[in-house]
Amino acid sequence: MSENPKRRSRRSVLQFLGRGIIGGMVFAECVGIDQLCDGPRAWGTSQQKPDSKSQAAGDYSSFGKQAAEALRKAIRFFATEVAREGGYVWTYSADLRFRQGEGRASETTVWVQPPGTPAVGAAILRAYERTGEEEYLEAARKAGECLARGQLESGGWTYRIEFSPDARRRFFYRTRPRNEKGFNWSTLDDDTTQSALRFLMELDRVLGFGNELIHECVQYGLTRLLAVQYPCGAWPQGFREPPDPTAYPVLGATYPEEIPPAPNFKEYWRFYTLNDQAHMDTIRMLLLAAKIYGEPKYQKAAEKGGEFLLLAQMPDPQPAWAQQYNFQMHPAWARRFELPAIAGGESQDVLRVLMTLYQHTGREDFLAPIPRAVGYLKSSVLPDGRLARFYELKTNRPLYFTRDYRLTHDDQDLPTHYAFKVENCLPEIEVQCQRLRERQQPQSLRETPGPHLPPRPSLSAVERVIKTLDDRGRWVEKGRMETAGQSVGQVIRSQTFIANVDILSAYLAWLRSA
């Protein structure tokens, strides 16, 4: 098959903002660490700051009936008019004639990559747990069964699922028709397989582990994910089958003697990958699996993933992390704008997940790399207060690409599809690490799986969400669909649906708890 497990398509900043919240109730508990500095996880988060003026001016329950009706109308519209085969894409024209994910989508295509089917399904599932409305559980179940029908034989998912007979024949799905010669690369890129499993695990829990299709899909996916973990604890970006453990020695990270001037390995998705938080998302997902199923093997695999991060910390003078490593544990090329270098964004997410692992295990070695890494990264902050996405190996000079992909130290002609500067979250990371060392860490990560009271939304946010919903149950907004083939001025976004459903359901959960 010609489809690349890591397509060279356009990326937006949303891909660096959009995970975590789709993991459902339990996964959202990680917010204390994993959303430091707003972190890399923010699809639909409803953590608005309280609006003291609006709440002082009126009773917090004043929008109760309106919120319940708006939530019902919005979910019903998405589940009955927007969904295809129970699944969703990213963006729709207001009249639903055009659909797209990261690329154009047909009437029989749904998207897995956030904010696609798992993200929408998880928001609806949270709404069910917060309100008890059976209609929402049915919509979430359909989204889950849609994902189950798109699971590849390799155990995970690629970015989209096809449902037309002709298109399905190009993939090796586990469900019929099965094509053993079809595309069978599962991807951990952009939180794709991880988000599907997180949602399906939460759905499995809510359904009491009684839906055979959902439960078996999760168990198969988790089993295959454990099987493709390398001996060193890393995962590839994409996988079809387990690696031969004898072919991949366990090594610590070192600097290469020479850096190839351009990408020099065709199937770079086999490399040990931290890029776009792939490794860290996988660890978080396995910690959730350990909580939901009580299986030590998932915790063990997550810890092994953490041990890889200890191995992957570069030696001085740059004790942080690269986006990807080759099998000699040297920072390596991926795409032509993802080079062997220290990565400012991924390094911060490594620090977050190491703290999460410490919370789950109490293992001091997961905190040990943090002071050196933070000290180094603080010394590398740019004049504008941010961090560079890439720092040149050994020299530590910031690296950028021009719009025509020439490597440079100058930041004046950057492409717009990729963030070459990232937010500096080091102060928050330092504070959290100190609290953990003082045993002041939150205990929520050790709680039992299940719904917990979400952050309380402000009345002004609730009012805004209600007022912007139209009579059909749509949140229509200005926007462009570049793949529609013609100008589209008004769109419906799954990202907006997720955010607004979370606000309404969180508000109703607070009213129920009063």
Predicted regions and their residues:
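N-terminal secretory signal peptides
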Residues: 1-37
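C-terminal segment of N-terminal export signals and the immediately downstream linker at the start
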Residues: 7-8, 28-58
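Extended ligand-binding groove/face enriched in aromatic
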Residues: 82-280, 299, 315-338, 384-419
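Terminal, non-catalytic domain-edge segments
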Residues: 49-77, 195-220, 262-264, 284, ...
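Substrate-binding/active-site clefts of carbohydrate-active enzymes
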Residues: 312
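Short amphipathic alpha-helical segments enriched in leucine
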Residues: 18, 75-79, 83, 125
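A structural motif
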Residues: 276-279, 343-347
